[in-house]
């Protein structure tokens, strides 16, 4: 059995040790990534230093230059191994994060499903149908009430419009006849007026003005009679 197998076998024999939580495992992986990142930086610096030493010795100290190049190769090999390890750890961390996220999502969905089930247990489909039917009926009643309020209320006073118009015309005619009766017409003389003497050249100005005023009054009375006759017809 390989040493790696013995290591995992020995580690798994401890039943008292509880499995780590996803949060703890993620913390450990991030710490490992940080440590390997620092190791990468150290190796890259050492590689640059060994290259500088190899260039410095060059052909003057060939043995020292070769030793520097050998160390550079070892550091590059370690750096390659660390790159592979970091890739594996990064993949493992992302997978664990996804698993943890999926677990939390599943737990929350299960919690919500239980809550929904608890709510639905208190619901009866028959009661819901009855409630919706009752709501519909109440809405119909409210609509009928609104329509009833919007209609014209006559309180049973259904009269014939033509009959009312005829009665109104009769009242207007009676009022018109009453006004005609109250109007006093000018008295018409029963006998013919005496003939007026012809004006002589010697008629005074006072007599002429009196005659003109009498003639004007007679014309005004004739106009009033004509207006009353036209209004009566």
UniProtKB/Swiss-Prot annotation:
Residues found modified as Phosphoserine: 210
GO molecular function, one term: protein homodimerization activity
Comp. bias regions, Low complexity: 204-216
UniProt region (Intramolecular interaction with N-terminus), positions on chain: 154-233
One Pfam match: Snf7
Keywords: Coiled coil, Cytoplasm, Endosome, Membrane, Phosphoprotein, Protein transport, Transport
Name used for this protein in its record: Charged multivesicular body protein 4c
Protein task: Probable core component of the endosomal sorting required for transport complex III (ESCRT-III) which is involved in multivesicular bodies (MVBs) formation and sorting of endosomal cargo proteins into MVBs. MVBs contain intraluminal vesicles (ILVs) that are generated by invagination and scission from the limiting membrane of the endosome and mostly are delivered to lysosomes enabling degradation of membrane proteins, such as stimulated growth factor receptors, lysosomal enzymes and lipids. The MVB pathway appears to require the sequential function of ESCRT-O, -I,-II and -III complexes.
Top-rank taxon: Eukaryota
UniProt PTM: Phosphorylated at Ser-210 by AURKB during cytokinesis: together with ZFYVE19/ANCHR, phosphorylated CHMP4C retains abscission-competent VPS4 (VPS4A and/or VPS4B) at the midbody ring until abscission checkpoint signaling is terminated at late cytokinesis.
InterPro entries for the chain: Snf7_fam (IPR005024)
PANTHER family from the UniProt entry: CHARGED MULTIVESICULAR BODY PROTEIN (PTHR22761), CHARGED MULTIVESICULAR BODY PROTEIN 4C (PTHR22761:SF77)
Organism: Homo sapiens (Human)
GO biological process, one term: ubiquitin-independent protein catabolic process via the multivesicular body sorting pathway
Note: Its overexpression strongly inhibits HIV-1 release.
Tissues in which the UniProt entry reports expression: Expressed in heart, spleen and kidney.
Compartments it resides in: Cytoplasm, Cytosol; Late endosome membrane; Midbody, Midbody ring
Domain remark from Swiss-Prot or TrEMBL: The acidic C-terminus and the basic N-terminus are thought to render the protein in a closed, soluble and inactive conformation through an autoinhibitory intramolecular interaction. The open and active conformation, which enables membrane binding and oligomerization, is achieved by interaction with other cellular binding partners, probably including other ESCRT components.
Intramolecular interaction with C-terminus: region residues: 1-153
Complex and partners: Probable core component of the endosomal sorting required for transport complex III (ESCRT-III). ESCRT-III components are thought to multimerize to form a flat lattice on the perimeter membrane of the endosome. Several assembly forms of ESCRT-III may exist that interact and act sequentially. Self-associates. Interacts with CHMP2A. Interacts with CHMP4A. Interacts with CHMP4B. Interacts with CHMP6. Interacts with VPS4A. Interacts with PDCD6IP; the interaction is direct.
Record region (Disordered): 1-24, 173-233
Coiled-coil region list: 125-183
Recorded family membership: Belongs to the SNF7 family.
């Amino acid at each position: 059995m390989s040493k790696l197998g013995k290591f995992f076998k020995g580690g798994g024999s401890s039943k008292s040790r509880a499995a780590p939580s996803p949060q703890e495992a993620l913390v450990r992986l991030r710490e490992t990534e940080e440590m390997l990142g620092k190791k990468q930086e150290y190796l890259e610096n050492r590689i640059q230093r060994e290259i500088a030493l190899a260039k410095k010795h060059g052909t003057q100290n060939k043995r020292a230059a070769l030793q520097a190049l050998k160390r550079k190769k070892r550091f590059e090999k370690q750096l390659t191994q660390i790159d592979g390890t970091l890739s594996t750890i990064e993949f493992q961390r992302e997978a664990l994060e996804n698993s943890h996220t999926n677990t939390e999502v599943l737990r929350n969905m299960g919690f919500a499903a239980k809550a929904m089930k608890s709510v639905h247990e208190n619901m009866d489909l028959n009661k819901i149908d009855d409630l919706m039917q009752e709501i519909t009926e109440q809405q119909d009643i409210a609509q009928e009430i609104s329509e009833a309020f919007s209609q014209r209320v006559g309180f049973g006073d259904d009269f014939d419009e033509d009959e009312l118009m005829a009665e109104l015309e009769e009242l207007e005619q009676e009022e018109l006849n009453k006004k005609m009766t109250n109007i006093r017409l000018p008295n018409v003389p029963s006998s013919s007026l005496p003939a007026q003497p012809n004006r002589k050249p010697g008629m005074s100005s006072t007599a002429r003005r009196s005659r003109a005023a009498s003639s004007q009054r007679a014309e005004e009375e004739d106009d009033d009679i004509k207006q009353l006759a036209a209004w009566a017809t």
